[in-house]
């Protein structure tokens, strides 16, 4: 009898054990990201907001009559940024930093040409640390190699500086979360330098979408398709033994869309991401590496057995509100440059590459304020040139009206770089929220590691982290911020007066040096 009771108790324990919920298995990636399965979807562990820490949605800083800037990274993109800032009133270039002191010194010639005073020079692996400690810098503009974006930004934020970071601004989820937390704790801006949000077609189309020209936009595409075969040798190499350069080596070691922001940024603004909608689920798929693998073998003379980044990567995202985003990445195969930028609305369609055009029916075009000049206008084809020109003229973005002409003169990827820099300075001078915040940065840069996790698990669905921590629906609709005409005029007058005096000083300093 006693034996029977023991057997019954043991059996009951087995049943209870089998029926009790088991803790899900926690997996850890090589980047330290923890995730687990939940009903067939991968859920990445996200940190809670620490007590006392607040969101920076809509963050503003006190107005700055003058924006004092330190530039870090003066290789391929940095010098162009220095040059553009000499054309923006109310800015002062205080310091220049690069690993190679010759590159930093070379940018003094840009200042000389613009009659701007010399800047302080910093160099070496950690030269940026001293730059960030200066008390006469408001903004640190970062255009270094990808792996240095985060440590430089972290140092700048910890030293009380606003930061503007070239793309991709963060290379993994941990860096995304760290920048979110740093911006929230320091109350400093963390701006992603995504220039493609300021290109002409994208800005005008955004304005059309916000005014209902396409109806509800339910699907969007973006991409970075750019054959870099002519550029691989121009990326910085760390000594004679470095045969690949930093960018090719990063592609070799990392799977996923490592350069997603050019394609994702503009369409995320159209879809009001974390301003009424959010990216909810992601899945990614890539081809095998053929060109990338071959490049490494040609440059090293050794077999490459594990080139992680596929020659072409496609990432699909579903939003909370049932929209779909498709983002592509290909820097390997021969084909024309292409960022796709395609919007599918319930009443119209927009497409940038390879042919710019809009497709609207006659009724929708009329409802959008443009009267068709042809009979039987149909959305089966793009608008005729006259109708397209009229639509673009009606919905030309206010920012393009303000900066477009001078941007074409100054340049920088056709002018969009100058518009981006000008808007950054404008918002700082007028104490406004920036066009992109740290949550944009984190969301757009997160595609790389999230896609890698998806593909390393048979292209499984991955839940997208909510970097706003539940506040993605607080703001209704993406909007650019503007000062009142009176405030804008007062700010610009002060900016121009400062720059005029600065150039007088600079011209005297350079003349004195020439006389030595």
Curated annotation (Swiss-Prot):
Superkingdom of this entry's organism? Answer: Bacteria
Q: Which InterPro entries match?
A: Gfo/Idh/MocA-like_OxRdtase_N, Gfo/Idh/MocA_oxidrdct_glycsds, Glyco_hydro_109_C, NAD(P)-bd_dom_sf
Sites of S-diacylglycerol cysteine lipidation: 19
Q: Name one GO molecular function term.
A: nucleotide binding
Q: What is its EC number?
A: 3.2.1.-
Q: Which residues form the signal peptide?
A: 1-18
> What are the binding positions for NAD(+) in this chain?
76-77, 98, 146-149, 166-167, 195, 259
Its topology with respect to the membrane?
A: Lipid-anchor
Pfam name, any one = Glyco_hydro_109_C
Where found, per UniProt?
Cell membrane
Establish whether keyword Hydrolase is in the entry: yes
Cofactor binding note: Binds 1 NAD(+) per subunit. The NAD(+) cannot dissociate.
Query: Which residues are covalently lipidated (N-palmitoyl cysteine)?
Result: 19
Task: Enumerate the residues binding substrate.
Answer: 224, 247, 259-262, 337
Q: What is this protein called?
A: Glycosyl hydrolase family 109 protein 4
- Record organism: Phocaeicola vulgatus (strain ATCC 8482 / DSM 1447 / JCM 5826 / CCUG 4940 / NBRC 14291 / NCTC 11154)
């Amino acid at each position: 009898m006693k034996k029977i009771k023991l057997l019954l108790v043991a059996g009951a324990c087995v049943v209870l054990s089998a029926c009790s919920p088991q803790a899900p298995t926690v997996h850890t990636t090589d980047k330290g990201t923890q995730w687990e399965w939940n009903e067939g979807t991968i859920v990445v562990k996200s940190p809670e907001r620490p007590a006392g820490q607040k969101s920076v949605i809509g963050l503003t800083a006190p107005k700055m009559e003058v924006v004092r800037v330190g530039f870090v990274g003066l290789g391929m993109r940095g010098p162009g940024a220095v040059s553009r800032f000499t054309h923006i009133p109310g800015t002062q270039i205080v310091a220049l930093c690069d690993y190679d002191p010759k590159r930093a010194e070379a940018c003094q010639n840009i200042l000389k040409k613009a009659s701007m005073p010399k800047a302080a020079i910093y160099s070496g692996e950690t030269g940026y640390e001293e730059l960030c400690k200066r008390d006469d810098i408001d903004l640190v503009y970062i255009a270094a190699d990808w792996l240095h974006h985060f440590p430089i930004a972290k140092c700048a934020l910890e030293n009380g500086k606003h930061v503007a970071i070239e793309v991709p601004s963060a290379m993994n989820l941990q860096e995304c979360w760290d920048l979110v937390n740093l911006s929230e704790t320091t109350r400093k801006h963390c701006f992603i330098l995504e220039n493609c949000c300021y290109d002409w077609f994208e800005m005008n189309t955004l304005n059309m979408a916000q005014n209902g020209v396409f109806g509800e936009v339910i699907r969007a595409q973006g991409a970075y398709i750019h054959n870099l075969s002519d550029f691989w040798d121009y990326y910085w190499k760390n000594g004679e033994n470095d045969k690949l350069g930093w960018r090719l080596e990063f592609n070799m070691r990392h799977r996923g869309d490592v350069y997603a922001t050019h394609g994702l940024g503009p369409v995320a603004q159209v879809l009001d991401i974390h301003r009424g909608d959010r990216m909810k689920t992601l899945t990614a798929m890539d081809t095998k590496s053929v060109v990338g693998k071959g490049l490494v073998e040609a440059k090293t003379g050794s077999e490459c057995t594990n080139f992680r980044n596929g020659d072409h990567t496609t990432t699909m995202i579903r939003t909370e509100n049932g929209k779909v985003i498709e983002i592509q990445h290909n820097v390997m195969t021969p084909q024309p440059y292409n960022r796709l930028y395609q919007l599918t609305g319930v009443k119209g369609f927009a497409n940038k590459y390879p042919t710019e055009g809009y497709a609207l029916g006659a009724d929708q075009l009329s409802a959008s304020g443009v009267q068709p000049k042809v009979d039987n206008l149909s959305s089966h084809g793009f608008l005729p040139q006259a109708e397209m020109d009229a639509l673009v003229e009606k919905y030309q973005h206010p920012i393009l009206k303000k900066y477009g002409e001078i941007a074409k003169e100054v340049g920088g990827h056709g002018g969009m770089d100058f518009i981006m820099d000008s808007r950054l300075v404008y918002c700082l001078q007028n104490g406004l929220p920036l066009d992109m915040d740290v949550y944009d940065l984190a969301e757009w840069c997160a595609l790389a590691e999230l896609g890698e996790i998806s593909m390393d698990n048979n292209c499984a669905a991955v839940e997208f982290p909510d970097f706003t921590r539940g506040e993605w629906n607080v703001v209704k609709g993406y909007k650019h911020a503007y000062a009142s005409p009176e405030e804008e005029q007062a700010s610009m007058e002060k900016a121009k007066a400062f720059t005029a005096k600065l150039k007088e000083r600079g011209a005297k300093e350079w003349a004195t040096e020439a006389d030595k």
